[in-house]
From Swiss-Prot:
Residues 501-523 are annotated as: Disordered. Residues 501-512 have a biased composition (Polar residues). Its main location: virion. This is Baseplate wedge protein gp10. Belongs to the T4likevirus baseplate wedge protein gp10 family. GO terms for biological process: viral release from host cell; viral tail assembly.
Length: 602
C-alpha cells in the first residue's frame, strides 16, 4: 500500500515526518513496487509473474491485478476469484501454466457468490497444457477470458476431434507402431493405448513404469512420447490387437463429455505423505476395501455418471459386480450360491464387491468405490466416464429420450443489438446504464431463452410470492423496484412536462434527459384559494353591520335613536367555511391492490 511522506504545514513546524521515517516510507514504497513489478530487485517491463505451487495449498485466493504462474505438479489448485463491484470492471487477473502440468492436475476457477464465469456460476476446470488465462472482470459481475489460448498457440476450434487407429499384429514380438496417424501428430497429453482390450499405463509423465512411449535412438530404447510413434514395452503375439486413440484440439470440450481421474495408492506404513485429492491416497492398504470417489478430485457440480463408469486397477479393466456372470451377492463363511442354503450352512449372504461395486447416495450419485482386491504400495486406480449417457451404447430412440430431458432444441441465432447493462445496482436507472455490444444469441440453453424474455431492466410482478424471483425462476439477479409507487408510460413527445423528462438524470446544466426514470406526484394535496374558481351565493342576504343602511325593528327617523329596539343591516354576499384555515388535504390515491414488484439488474 502506498505511503505518503508527511511534509508538515511549514518548514520545521514539527508536524511532518522526520528524515529517517520518510526514508523508511520511501524504501518500503520502492520495495513493494519492485516486488509487484519484478523480482524484488529488478523491475520487469514485460510484467511480473509470481509462482504459486500446489504444495503451498490447494486453494489460491487471487488478488486484483496480479499474475500467477501456477505449478500443479504436486496436485490440483482451485482459484477463488475476488468479489467485485462496479468500480472493479476492467480489472484483470492472469494465470498461466509454464510448468506444463495443468493437463495432469487441472486448475479450477471459482467465481464469488453472485458473480459468474462466462455467464455461469458453475466452477470451470482448465485442463489444457500451457494454458494462458487473462481473466477480465466485466459487467454485470461476469468474468471473461479467451478460450483455447495457450502459451505456445491458440487452437482453431473448441470442437473435440477424436482419432482412432486399430492394428492386428501379424509379426511375432512386434513393439513398434510408427507414424500412427500417417503424418498427423497425436496429442501426447490425451492418448489411450490398449493391448488386447486392456488399457496400458503411461502416467502423468513418462517413467520406468510406463507401459508405452516412443522409440529412442538406440535399439529397444523407450523414450517419452514424440507425437507420431508408439513403442510398447512388452512385445505382442501374432493375433493380438492394439488400439490407439487420441483427442486433438478442443480438449476442454472433450473433457466436458469425457472425464478421466486417477490416483496412486500409498501405504501409510511405508510413507509419511498425506492424501492429496486427485493425486495420491494414503491409508493402511492391508485393511482398505473401499475408497471415496472424492479422493479422485472431482469437480463440484460434475458428478460421476454410473451408467458409463469404467474402473481400472493398474491399467486392467475391472468388471462391475453382477455383470459378465459375476455374482451380485455371495455367501461368506460357507460354500453356496443360494441365499437360503447359505443361511442353512451358517453363512452370511452379502453383497459382492468382485471386481468392484459402487455405493451411491439417495440421489443416485456415486459416493464410494468398494472392491475385494488387495492393493500394494504404488498401485494405481484409474476411473473414466462420460458425463452423459450419450457416451454409452444407447439406441437412437434412447438418445432422443435422454437429450429431450437435457437439452434445448436449437434454432437459428438472432442478432441482439439493443441490449443494456446496469452499472450501479444501488442507483437503478439512467445515467447508470450502458449499452452492450451487438452479438448473436443462440437458443441452445434455458438461460438464453430466459435472457430473451427477461432482459436486464425488465420489471416483474407477483401477486402472492414475496421471495426474490431468482429463488423460484432460477435465473438472474433481482431487486425490489418502485416501492409504494405506480408506473406511468414514458412519453416520446419531449414537450410533455410530466412524463417525457427524467429529473433523476441531469446534465451539467441541470437539464433533465429525455429518458425514462423520472419521478413525481404525491399521495395527497391541500387545496388553496388559487385552486378554486370564484364563488358567491345565488341570492343577496342581509348582513348585520353597525354601519349598514338597512334598519329593521325601530323608527326610521328617531333623532336620538332612543326609540324602540332596532338592528342595522347591509346587503352583501355570504362567506362559507371561514374557519377552515388551513383546509383538510385531499387524498389522490385511486383504488389499488399491492403486488411484489422486482426489476432484473443482472
Amino acid at each position: 500500500m502506498k505511503q505518503n511522506i508527511n511534509i508538515g504545514n511549514v518548514v520545521d513546524d514539527g508536524t511532518g515526518d522526520y528524515l529517517r521515517k520518510g526514508g523508511i516510507k520511501i524504501n518500503e514504497n520502492f520495495d513493494e513496487l519492485y516486488y509487484e513489478l519484478g523480482d524484488g530487485d529488478v523491475p520487469y517491463s514485460a510484467g511480473a509473474w509470481k509462482t504459486y505451487n500446489a504444495s503451498s495449498g490447494q486453494t489460491l485466493t487471487a488478488e486484483w491485478g496480479k499474475s500467477y504462474a501456477i505449478n500443479t505438479s504436486s496436485g490440483r489448485v482451485t482459484i477463488n476469484l475476488p468479489k467485485g463491484t462496479v468500480n472493479d470492471y476492467n480489472k484483470v487477473i492472469r494465470a498461466r501454466d509454464v510448468f506444463a502440468t495443468w493437463n495432469v492436475n487441472p486448475v479450477t476457477l471459482v467465481a464469488a457468490s453472485g458473480d459468474t464465469i462466462k455467464g455461469s456460476a458453475v466452477p470451470v476446470e482448465i485442463n489444457v497444457r500451457f494454458s494462458d488465462l487473462e481473466l477480465v472482470y466485466c459487467a454485470p459481475g461476469r468474468w471473461e477470458y479467451v478460450k483455447n489460448k495457450q502459451i505456445d498457440k491458440i487452437t482453431s476450434s473448441d470442437i473435440s476431434n477424436v482419432a482412432r487407429k486399430e492394428f492386428l499384429v501379424e509379426v511375432q514380438g512386434q513393439t513398434d507402431f510408427l507414424d500412427v496417424f500417417r503424418g498427423t501428430s497425436y496429442n501426447v497429453n490425451n492418448i489411450r493405448v490398449k493391448h488386447r482390450g486392456n488399457e496400458l499405463y503411461y502416467g502423468d509423465v513418462f517413467s520406468e513404469n510406463s507401459d508405452f512411449g516412443s522409440p529412442g535412438e538406440n535399439e529397444g530404447e523407450l523414450v517419452p512420447l514424440d507425437g507420431f510413434n508408439i513403442r510398447l514395452r512388452q512385445p505382442c503375439n501374432i493375433g493380438d490387437t492394439v488400439q490407439i486413440e487420441t483427442f486433438m484440439d478442443g480438449v476442454s470440450q472433450w473433457r466436458s463429455s469425457y472425464t478421466r481421474r486417477q490416483i496412486r495408492l500409498l501405504d501409510s506404513k511405508l510413507t509419511s505423505k498425506t492424501s492429496l485429492e486427485g493425486s495420491i491416497y494414503v491409508t493402511d492398504l492391508s485393511t482398505m476395501k473401499s475408497i471415496p470417489f472424492s479422493a479422485f478430485g472431482l469437480i463440484p457440480g460434475e458428478p460421476i455418471n454410473p451408467n458409463s463408469l469404467e474402473v481400472r486397477f493398474n491399467g486392467i479393466l475391472q468388471e462391475l459386480a453382477g455383470t459378465v456372470g459375476m455374482p451380485l451377492f455371495h455367501c461368506v463363511g460357507a460354500d453356496s450360491d443360494d441365499e437360503v442354503e447359505c443361511s442353512v450352512l451358517g453363512g452370511t449372504w452379502e453383497q459382492s464387491h468382485t471386481d468392484y461395486s459402487v455405493e451411491t447416495d439417495e440421489n443416485g450419485i456415486p459416493e464410494i468405490l468398494h472392491f475385494d482386491s488387495v492393493f500394494e504400495h504404488g498401485d494405481i486406480i484409474n476411473i473414466t466416464w462420460f458425463n452423459n449417457d450419450l457416451g454409452t451404447l444407447l439406441t437412437k430412440d434412447e438418445i432422443i429420450d435422454e437429450t429431450d430431458n437435457l437439452y434445448v432444441s436449437q434454432g437459428p441465432g438472432v442478432d441482439i443489438s439493443g441490449d443494456v447493462n446496469l452499472t450501479d445496482f444501488d442507483k437503478i436507472g439512467w445515467p447508470n446504464v450502458e449499452a452492450v455490444q451487438s452479438y448473436q444469441r443462440a437458443f441452445n440453453a434455458v438461460s438464453n431463452i430466459f435472457d430473451t424474455i427477461y432482459p436486464i431492466g425488465t420489471i416483474y410482478e407477483n401477486a402472492v410470492n414475496p421471495n426474490n424471483p431468482v429463488t423460484y425462476m432460477g435465473f438472474g439477479s433481482w431487486k425490489l423496484f418502485g416501492q409504494g409507487k405506480v408506473l406511468v408510460g414514458w412519453n416520446e413527445d419531449i414537450s410533455d412536462p410530466n412524463f417525457a423528462l427524467n429529473n433523476n438524470d441531469l446534465d451539467s446544466g441541470g437539464n433533465p434527459s429525455h429518458t425514462a426514470g423520472g419521478t413525481g406526484g404525491s399521495t395527497s394535496v391541500t387545496l388553496e384559494n388559487a385552486n378554486l374558481p370564484a364563488t358567491e351565493t345565488d341570492e343577496e342576504v342581509l348582513i348585520v353591520d353597525e354601519n349598514g343602511s338597512v334598519i329593521v325593528g325601530g323608527c326610521q327617523y328617531d333623532p336620538d335613536e332612543s326609540g324602540p329596539i332596532y338592528t342595522k343591516y347591509r346587503e352583501a354576499k355570504a362567506s362559507t367555511n371561514s374557519t377552515h384555515t388551513p383546509p383538510t388535504s385531499i387524498t389522490n390515491i385511486q383504488p389499488y391492490i399491492t403486488v411484489y414488484r422486482w426489476i432484473r439488474i443482472a
